Structures are given as structure tokens and as C-alpha cells.
Amino acid sequence: MLAFILSNLTGLVRQVLILKAFGTENALDAFNAASTYTDLLFSLIAGGALASAFVPTFTAFLAKEDRTSAWRLASALINLVLLILCLTSLLSGLFAPQLVKLVLAPKFTPPLQELTATLLRVLLIAPAVFGLSGLFMGILNAHQVFFWPALAPTMYWLGMILGVLFLAPSMGVYGLAWGAVLGAILHLLVQLPAFLALPARRYSRTLGLSSPPLRQVGRLMAPRLLGVAVVQINFVVNTILATGQPEGSLTALKSAWAVMTMPQVVIAQAIAIALSEQRRAAKRRRKRK
């Protein structure tokens, strides 16, 4: 719980510093439009839908003391997620101007669309890093390790804070974008020592496309993915609508959403993750008896 509170306080500080540095100028609107797309990529491919399907399947193998199968599944998902996110990010970077003009910000002026496309290419480094980090988070939670995954979002905000304070004065909004990339890397690195310390950890170079456990993850993921897609499409629609409004409208919308969801993350998400993993642990203990 404390780690979640720290994360949200750090996120609030980040939001204040960003608004202080950029106000509601067009450059920040461009950054927010670009980040909407990278958030969409991560959420659809490696976000909560995947975690909610992967963790129960992975935990079931742990309950049966079948760590070989558990890590084979984890390896397959790590490889598959990285492959999909890297290819998608590469293609998105190549067609960034078209994405911005036709999908993300059709009502921006041409110079602002160009800035958005450039920022998008920088931010596209982050989804693959977040994808790997998100899987680390699920694996650690399945092993009853909660502190480091809960601290990871704080490190992401910290990276953005460093970008605002030290890069933005000389690089402008590009400093904020590179700060976001740094934050994604810190999000991964803070979990890495705990991940490497897990027992019987074994990585294999396989995609496992025909394996029953991976197919089970896909089946569990499908209905959740539909819900995530609806939410993310709503964000994209809001972004498109905001780009046709006065300068700063998109920034105001994003800031308001961040403040509104803060209590949910601090209280509901922290309790839900802890209770979910405790329930799975209790189930494993009953099976052993």
C-alpha cells in the first residue's frame, strides 16, 4: 500500500512539474497525443488483460510444483510480447506521420503534427520495455513479491521528473519524451534484481505458439482484451476531439483524468493485487494438503 501511495504522490509531483514547465502550450498537447498511442500499444498487447490471464496460469503451475512448465510459459510470453511490440513499434515509427495525420491528431496544424510524429518515434522505444517489465511484475506477484512491482511506477514517474528538470531546459518537450523512455527503463530495472533472485528461474528461446498453456492464456485474455480495447479506443476518440479544441485542451483533459483516477490506484488497485495473490497462495496451500 505504501508503495502505491508513494507512486501516486510522485505522479502528482510529476504532473505539477510538467505543467509548471510547459503550461498548456501546444508542445505538451503534441506529447500527450503521442503518448496516447504508445499507451494503446502497451495496453492492448502487454497490459492488464495479459497479466490477468497469464498470472493465474503461471500460478497454477507453481501450485503443482511444475516450475519447468511455468518458466516455459513465461519464456514464451516474454519472447512473443517482445517480438510483437518491437515489430509494431518499428512499423509505427516508419508510418508515424500518417498515424498522426489520419488517426491521432487530424486537427492539429501541420507543424504540430510533425512535432507529434517526432515525439511518437521517441516514445515508441518504451512499449517493448514496459512489456517486459509488465511480465516481470506478474511473475514477481505470483511469487508473493509485491514491493518491487509496486515501486516500479514510482521509478517511471521519477524518470519523467528527471526529464523535466534536467533535459527539458535545453531540449524542450523532447526532454520530457526522453525522460519517459528513461522512466520505462527504470520501471524495468527496479524489478530486475528480485526477478533474477527467483528460484528455479529458467529462460528458453521459444514462442510456444502450439502449446496448450499459451492457448489457455489467449482464451482467458480475449474477453478482458475486449474491455481494454473499448477503454483505449475511448481515449483515442477523446484525443481526436481535443485536438480540434483550443490550445491546451488535450493537456487539461489528460491532467484531469490523472487526478480523477488517483484514489482508485492508491486504494482499490493496491488492495486488489494483494488480495488476489493471497487468494492464490491459499489455494496452493490447500492443494498441498
Give the residues covered by each predicted segment.
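Membrane-embedded alpha-helical bundles of multi-pass transporters/translocases
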Residues: M1-K289
